[in-house]
Structure formats: structure tokens, C-alpha cells
Amino acid sequence: MAKKSTIITNWPKYLLQWGVLVALIVFITGLIPSEVAVDPEAYCPMGGLQALATYLANNSLPCSMSSLQVMMGIALVAAVVLFSKLFCAFICPLGTVHDLISKARNAMHIKSLNIRNGSVADKVLRIVKYALLFWIFYSTVNASELFCKNLDPYYAIATGFKGDITLWMSIVSICIVVLGSFLVDMFWCRYLCPLGAISNTFKFWLWIGVLFGVYYLADVLGANIPWAVLLGAFCLVGYLLEIFHAKPKLQVLKVQKNMAACNNCGLCMKKCPYHIDIKSCQGAVDSVDCTLCGECVASCSTGALQVGVTAKAKGKLWNILPAVLTVVLIAFGMWAGGKFELPTIDMKWGMEVMGPDSTMVKVVDMDDLETVTIEGLRSV
């Protein structure tokens, strides 16, 4: 059966994906003049999660991070725990570029290389993103500086290769994104994206909750286990769960399959960006790769697939719910991020004296000031 386009039937996905990509291009290139310099990291959840880890480990934040990015990272995790990988489906610019390149390849009638889900090659390649996750977070927390900027293809392009990058790392990353997505569907997302590793791991949030609980209990009991051990355990547990138990069942929303309406045509699997074997699913589609992007639902000619809490969910409104939830969670992250600031400096200078209005004020004697050298800060 020929594959039909889902751009119209799955319009919420494309509206958000292309809208975000166009907005980034417009603001970063300066097509809309602004008195304030555009920060390509302003709403980055990956940077926010690295900042949160640094804050918890060192009580400091990377110099370019704030509570806004931290809240965006928390919003991403909340979306994964409750629903699915909504950021991956609707917002991520790298995922959108991946999708566009795949569509261009299909338009040229070039077949992609097939790395079957669950194959030996698939399982081996999936470990790479967890290795990158450990490397990036370990380096970031140790230096209190976002290490991912050295190799992030989005950051390199968004800054015109003028940001705090390592040129050869950035070029290699960009080549991998372009060539990988042209040769293998969702190559970056499946095998290399560290944020994808975080998202996949938090799909098994009960296991991760137990892991964090054990670490906290050990700390209370005085074990003083280094934070890097927790990071390593997080990556290892996430990888093992992904390859040996790739069917998380703890999310509220899922793609539900009506077995009676399904004609086993297999079109849903072909349209799925990750080629999840939906045809073999019984009832709910439980897959660690599922992002609730809606491609399978939009391509089904018999109406056998539906987004919902249970198989009894009916109506088209359910199918646009993931996109709506994405917007709501992002709006919440932006709102919450503007409501507070994480305190990272608690040192005070000067001598407190009684002011004219009977309030205590800080007085600094300029003669007593000394030069303070702060290591580890880098300009952007």
C-alpha cells in the first residue's frame, strides 16, 4: 500500500515543529530586529537539566543558565513521566531537521538503511547516547560549565560557529546529523542524542525513583557515595531497561489499538519515524521509542489507532491532546522559571551598620578590597 502524506491529517505536529524551527531561524538570524541579543540556549531543556545536576552537586550554575532553563528541563521530565517524549515529537529542532531530511530522501526514492529495532546492531548502537550522556554531565558538573556546547550541532549553527564551541566536535556532530538522518531513519535520536537517553530512562520512572531513593538513603546513612556513581548507575540502568525491557507501561497517554478495526496492512509501522512494530501490538502501543507524534494514527485508513488513556477513548480531540499538552507544559516552564531564581552565591561582603532610617545597611571599605580570581569562568 502506498504511503500517503500526513501533513494535513497530523497538522498539530507539523504546526509546532515547523513553527518552532521558523521562529528560531527568524530570531537567530535577526530578521526581526531586537535590542536584546538572542540567546539560543534560552529555553534549552538539556542545558536546564545539566544546570540542575550542577546545582544539586555543587550548589552552582553554569554561567549562562538560569531558573528558566532548569524549569524547562523539569517540564520535559514531567512530560516524559506522565505522557511521553513530547519535546522530541513536537519541539526539538534537530528532530525536525531529521524529519525534513528523511522526507527529502523519500522524495528522491532513496531507501534508508534498515537497522531493525531489537537487532544486535540496534542494541549496540543505543549504548552510544548513554556514553555521551555520562561524558557530558560528568564534564559539566565538574567544570560548572555546559560541556555540551562543545559538540551540540544546534548550538554551533545557532551561534554561527561563534559560540563557546570546539570546532571539530561541532563539525563532526553536524555531519553525523545530516548524513545519519539521510541514511538511517531517526539515527541521531535513536543512537546519539543524550537528551533522548534521559527521556527514555525517565519513561521507566519507577525504577529511577528507586535508584534515586537508594542513593539518598545511602547518603543519609553516611555512605557519602560520589555523585558520579549515581550518574553512571542512571546511564547503565537506562540502557539496560531500554534494550531488555523496551515496553514502559507507566505513562498515562498512549496510542491505543482497536484490534477489531485493524486490517494488518502495516502502514502504521512504515509511517512511524522509529518503525515501531505497531502491527504486532495488542491494545496499547508500549514502546520506549514512542513519542506520541501521531504519525501512525494519522496514516491509519481504518481508524484502528487512537491516542487515549484507554482503548475506549474516542474522538479526534484525543489525537491533538499531546500537542496541546506540549504547549501547556512549555508555558508552565516559562511561567515558573520567571517566578524564582536559584541562589548560587551566599557570600556577603562588608560591615553592617545602622543607616539613617534605622535600618541595617552594608558598608564596604574600598581600601580593604582585594582582587578575587575566579577560575572556571569562560566568556561566550
What are these regions (language model features)?
Residues 291:
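Conserved, short, structured surface segments that act as functional micro-motifs
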